[in-house]
Amino acid sequence: MHSDLLNSQSETLLALCRPGFEADLAAELNFHAADQMVAGYPRATANSGYVLWHSQQGSLASLQESGLIFARTLSVCEGEFSDIGDDRISALWPLLEAAGPFSELYLEHPDTNEGRELQRFLRGFRKALEPRLKKVGLLRRQAKQRLHLFFSDSHNGWVGTSPSAVPLVEGGVLRLRLPAEAPSRSALKVEEALIRFFGSADALNAKTAVDLGAAPGGWSWQLARRGIRVQAVDHGKMAPRLLDEYPVQHVYGDAFTWRPRSKVDLVVCDVVDKPARTLQHMEKWLTQGWATAALFNLKLPMKRRFQETWQLLEKLTAAMERMDHLGEPVIKAAHLYYDREEITVWASFHRSY
């Protein structure tokens, strides 16, 4: 057991990600470390599903609140445990006592085939640990930090914490149910994005929206089921039930050339195209005043995924900042659980969403 990972000069962060994106997450951590003049280095293994960041001087803990594109969760490590025996609670207890109290318990594992084999063990471990923590007051709802116990296997891992006020899902994996009436699985991306960015799938206060490249209508359905009137722009076929039962108007047109007659609250776009072209189009919708906010996907390049993505987001930020009469830009981006080779982006001029 190693409980002295942190001192006044050092810090270790544990970031979970989709397997295969460790290098992108490491590049993102390196970028923010350079930007904040924090000395340190990442430790990443391909397809492991997580990255460790070791700060030699300075801290990147502020990233827990601002978030990272490629990180599903981010916790500050309080200690590492290795080769602990079957009495895991006794082995971990001194560290838990020193780090507590906690608002909730997250038991996490890599999102890999091997990691998922730990789920049964972790369910049993929760039943044993959670009552013990509550009994001695180490687990109470009003605490300002949550506890992360990450197991790389059943005997090794890290103990970490994250601010309770930062909305996080255990393991960063938000498993959503797809209703039978949903036109496509892409509908889950919208729901996850709203929960990830705003803490609730019902956070939108929009009344009107445009869905560019809408067919068969997964994104339109997510908006319309919340009472938003949607213009669904696509030459393709929309789900008939969507048009019959929801406030959705099918507009035959091209996602990149169609223009609205009047301003809408929200434009959404999930098209398969070069990310630079998609971003430029969303930039136009926002800076021309056609929409107040945008939710869209950017397909990831094959190489330098973080660097290329960050450059595009910086370009969008600069363009929106030039329109300062519309307000301060708010841009959020994440590689969601239901994303694959893409990220989901929110951009607006208002903080009321």
Curated annotation (Swiss-Prot):
It holds the Pfam family RLMM_N. GO terms for molecular function: methyltransferase activity. Its EC number is 2.1.1.186. S-adenosyl-L-methionine binds at residues 186, 215-218, 234, 254, 270. One of its GO terms (cellular component) is cytoplasm. It is found in: Cytoplasm. Disulfide bonds: none annotated. One of its GO terms (biological process) is methylation. The active site is at 299 (proton acceptor). The keyword Transcription does not apply. InterPro entries: RlmM_FDX (IPR040739), RlmM_THUMP-like (IPR048646), RNA_MeTrfase_FtsJ_dom (IPR002877), rRNA_MeTrfase_M (IPR011224), SAM-dependent_MTases_sf (IPR029063). It comes from the Bacteria. It catalyses: cytidine(2498) in 23S rRNA + S-adenosyl-L-methionine = 2'-O-methylcytidine(2498) in 23S rRNA + S-adenosyl-L-homocysteine + H(+). Keywords: Cytoplasm, Methyltransferase, rRNA processing, S-adenosyl-L-methionine, Transferase. It is an enzyme of class 2 (transferase). Monomer. Catalyzes the 2'-O-methylation at nucleotide C2498 in 23S rRNA. Belongs to the class I-like SAM-binding methyltransferase superfamily. RNA methyltransferase RlmE family. RlmM subfamily. This is Ribosomal RNA large subunit methyltransferase M.
